[in-house]
């Protein structure tokens, strides 16, 4: 089963992502700040990290850089999931090592499509 770490300090976003992904047989972990995200990434080694830029302690850009600099964690996929939607924001996210960039508000269908693109054969719909 694919494991996804959601890093966001907005409970509504975390809940939306959790509901969207758990319905598709994806295990979801959560972190509300950068330090917790780094700890959980090291402990659980998720396949994918959905990472907000604006976190209360360490910025999402710094978390992304640290994950990509760690040889044991560098292969995990990272999607910046953030309201920062300017061209410069996107460039900074990708320069920090993010594999993709998804702006808020986002469509759950677009999120699933992006997860499937980055993690092929991950999404499996539960029977009705």
Annotate each predicted stretch with a short phrase.
Residues 14, 56, 74, 86, ...:
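The feature encodes the CheY-like receiver
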């Amino acid at each position: 089963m694919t494991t996804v770490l959601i890093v966001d300090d907005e409970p509504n976003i975390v809940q939306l992502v959790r509901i969207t992904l758990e319905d598709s047989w994806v295990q979801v972990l959560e972190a509300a700040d950068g330090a917790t995200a780094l700890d959980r990434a090291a402990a659980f080694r998720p396949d994918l990290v959905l990472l907000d830029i604006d976190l209360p302690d360490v910025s999402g850009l710094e978390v992304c850089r640290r994950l990509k600099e760690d040889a044991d964690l560098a292969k995990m996929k990272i999607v910046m999931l953030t309201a920062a939607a300017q061209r410069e924001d996107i460039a900074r996210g990708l320069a920090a090592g993010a594999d993709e960039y998804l702006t808020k508000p986002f469509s759950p269908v677009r999120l699933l499509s992006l997860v499937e693109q980055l993690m092929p054969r991950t999404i499996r719909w539960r029977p009705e």
